Each structure stands twice: as C-alpha cells, then as structure tokens.
C-alpha cells in the first residue's frame, strides 16, 4: 500500500480516537458541572444539565439501535448477539460500543499491508454512522448545554472554572462535529474529494463564528427572561418541524422512526443549517438563514426595549459588538467557502443497489458495504454538476 494511503488511514484512526476522547471529555465536563451545581445548592441547574444529558443519550441510543436493526444480516460479521446489543443500548452504551468497533476496524485496516476492499469499505461504513451520531449528539446535548451555561453565567455575573472548560469544549465540539460530518459526506461522493487544510479551517471557522451569535442571542434572552425561553424554543421548533415534514424526508428505515429524525433535525435547525432534501438547496438555506437572523434580531430588540442591564449588572451593550463582529466575519467566510471550495458532482442512478451494500461485487465476489444513509444525505447536500463527470476537486 502506498505511504499516502497508509497516512490517510492513520489520520482517520487518530481522528477517531480524538472524536471518542472529545465525547468522553464533554460528558465528563457536563457531569462535573452538574455535581458542582448540586453541591452549591443550585438543584434546578443541576437537574437541567442532567435532563439534557439524559434526553440526548436516549435519542442517540435509539438512532444507533434502529440503524443496527436495519443493516443487512451478516454485515457486521462477528458481533455480540442482538440481546446483548439491545442491553448495551438500554444501558446507554450503544454509541460507545460503536466507537470501539470503529477504532478496532480502523486499527485492523491500518495494520494490514494490503487491506481488502471489503475491510476498507466496512471501515468507512462504521465511520460514517459515527459521524452522523456525533452530529446528533452535538445539537441535542452540547448546543443546549452551552446555551444553558452561558445563561447561568450571564445571570449570576460570575464564571467558575468548570464553566469555562465546558464553554470551550462545547464550542470546539460543535464546530468539530459539523466539520467531521461534512468531511464524512465527501467520502460518499463519486470522486471522493478530500477536504483540504485550507477548506477545513474556513469551514470550521465559519460554523464557529455563525454559531456564537445565535447561542449568545438565546443565552442572553434566557438570562433576562428565564420563564419564556422554553416557550420561545417550542414555538420555533414546531415551525421548523413542520418545515422538515413538508420536505418529505426519508432517512430512517421506516415511517414511524422517521419522526425521530425529523424531531432531531428541527432541533439542529434551531441553531444551524442542515439540508435534508434535494432541489433548491441555496433557496432553502437562504430562507432558513433569514428566519434565524430575524429571530435573533427580535431577541436583541427584546433586550434593548426591556432592559439594558443583565441581572448580574453587566451592560448588554458590551455583547452586541462581539456578536455582530462574529456574525459578519462568519458570513463572509461562509460565502467564500460555498463560492470557491464547495464541490459539485454527478450522481449516477444505481437502481440495483440493496440497502446497506453495493450491488456490484468486489473482485473477490462479495458485496462491498456502502452506507446508504449517508450517501442519501450527500446526494442532497452537494449540488449536481451539469456535465457527466464529477467536477474537479476543490479545496
């Protein structure tokens, strides 16, 4: 195997280790914060942290279990019996099991001098599922936790060291999850264009810079009006859920479980853009962007008209220039990325494809695993080229 290929396998393995470590670090930070709140007598804050953790974990395990059940029989080879897997997910360990499975397969492939096509394809299959689950966990748990911690800090006027650790890990974790998801989608393209260093930095930064004003707007509103933030979230979330439903998503294996996906996507859309349907992607992205921007402006107007000071005595005017600066810089980087660095490709129909595996056989005569869930999303995320061949690799 060429050194470049072995280097790519090692890079994927290292990124897998870092992703798993980041998940455990984020989990530990949240539990640490909950314990500190409880020890300080702030039981409501501790309960909110644990509730967000619990709800996100249950959703994550449901996704993982439903996907395992939908995968073709024999795809995962030697794995624990279904009852053991069900117990792992019931104990909220299904995601970690998948992480261990991915790392083990990645290490196996890297150690082989000439890994088989099946082993390489199976490693990609596992990594794609992990990337999607990580994205779900990020917006179901990390983004709400970040908003909660910021609201607590702004309301109390003081920041503990564990809160600063949580804020830093949350912002980096969210941006990294979006970058990893985008990188994973690129592996589903026919030409498999890699996300270069420059493209990665720009994609990471514009997500971070656009996320900060949104989280700050909601956190400041929560600090000023803690009794109304749940109503605000529910109202917007229902509108976004209706929008997702109208787009006719078909990501999950059956119609009943599709609602779990729609509920999750609506939560993601509350914080950031997420494409779920083919067609006028740019138009839908602009509509969503204008919707979130209008909502954030309304939140800012609410601060200004009701109070110019936070309960902690911090003037709100200090935060507005920071949020505006991040917003315009993030918007500029986003335009740069989508104008010059976003790839397009030609998707050729594959009517003979069965769920979870390519219909074409490898030279050895067995089917190569293909993660159709992520391939389906990639077909929606990336524009189609006008010519018959994939466009030149960008970034």
Curated annotation (Swiss-Prot):
The modification Phosphothreonine is found at residue 375. Residues 1-12, 69-158, 222-223, 278-284, 334-395 are cytoplasmic. It is a multi-pass membrane protein. GO terms for biological process: apoptotic process involved in development; engulfment of apoptotic cell; establishment of localization in cell; neutrophil clearance; phosphatidylserine exposure on apoptotic cell surface; positive regulation of myoblast differentiation; tolerance induction to self antigen. Keywords: Apoptosis, Cell membrane, Cytoplasm, Membrane, Phosphoprotein, Transmembrane, Transmembrane helix. One of its GO terms (cellular component) is plasma membrane. The record marks 355-356 as: Cleavage. One of its GO terms (molecular function) is phospholipid scramblase activity. Expression is repressed in PLB-985 leukemia and Raji lymphoma cells due to CpG methylation near the transcription start site of XKR8 gene, possibly explaining the inability of PLB-985 leukemia and Raji lymphoma cells to expose phosphatidylserine during apoptosis. PANTHER family: XK-RELATED PROTEIN, XK-RELATED PROTEIN 8. This is XK-related protein 8. The lineage of its organism: Eukaryota, Metazoa, Chordata, Craniata, Vertebrata.
């Amino acid at each position: 195997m060429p050194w470049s290929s072995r280097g790519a396998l090692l890079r994927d393995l290292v990124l897998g280790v870092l992703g798993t470590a980041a998940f455990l670090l984020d989990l530990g930070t949240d539990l640490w914060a909950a314990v500190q709140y409880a020890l300080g007598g702030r039981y409501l804050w501790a309960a909110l942290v644990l509730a967000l953790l619990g709800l996100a974990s249950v959703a994550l395990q449901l996704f993982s279990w439903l996907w395992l059940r939908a995968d073709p029989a024999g795809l995962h080879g030697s794995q624990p019996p279904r009852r053991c897997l069900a117990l792992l997910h019931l104990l909220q360990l299904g995601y970690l099991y998948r992480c261990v499975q991915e790392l083990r397969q990645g290490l196996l492939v890297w150690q082989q001098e000439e890994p088989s096509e099946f082993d390489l394809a199976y490693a990609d299959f596992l990594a794609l599922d992990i990337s999607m689950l990580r994205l779900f966990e990020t917006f179901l748990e990390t983004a709400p936790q970040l908003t909660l911690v910021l609201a607590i800090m702004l309301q109390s006027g003081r920041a503990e060291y564990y809160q600063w650790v949580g804020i830093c890990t949350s912002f980096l974790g969210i941006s990294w999850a979006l970058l990893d998801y985008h990188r994973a989608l690129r592996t589903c393209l026919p030409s498999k264009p890699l996300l270069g260093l420059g493209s990665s930095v720009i994609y990471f930064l514009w997500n971070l810079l656009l996320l900060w004003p949104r989280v700050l707007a909601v956190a400041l509103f929560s600090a000023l009006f803690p009794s109304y933030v749940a109503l605000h979230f529910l109202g917007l979330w229902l509108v976004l859920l209706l929008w997702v439903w109208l787009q006719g998503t078909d990501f999950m294996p059956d119609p009943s479980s599709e609602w779990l996906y729609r509920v999750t996507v609506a939560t993601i859309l509350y914080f950031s853009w997420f494409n779920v349907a083919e067609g006028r992607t740019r138009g839908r992205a602009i509509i969503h962007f204008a919707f979130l921007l209008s909502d954030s402006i309304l939140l800012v107007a609410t601060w200004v008209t009701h109070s110019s000071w936070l309960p902690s005595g911090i003037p709100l005017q200090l935060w507005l220039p920071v949020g505006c600066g991040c917003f315009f810089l993030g918007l500029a980087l986003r335009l740069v990325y989508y104008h010059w660095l976003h790839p397009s490709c030609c998707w050729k129909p594959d009517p003979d494809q069965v769920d979870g595996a390519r219909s074409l056989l490898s030279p050895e005569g067995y089917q190569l695993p293909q993660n159709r869930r992520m391939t389906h999303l990639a077909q929606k995320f990336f524009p189609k080229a006008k010519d018959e061949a994939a466009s030149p690799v960008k970034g």
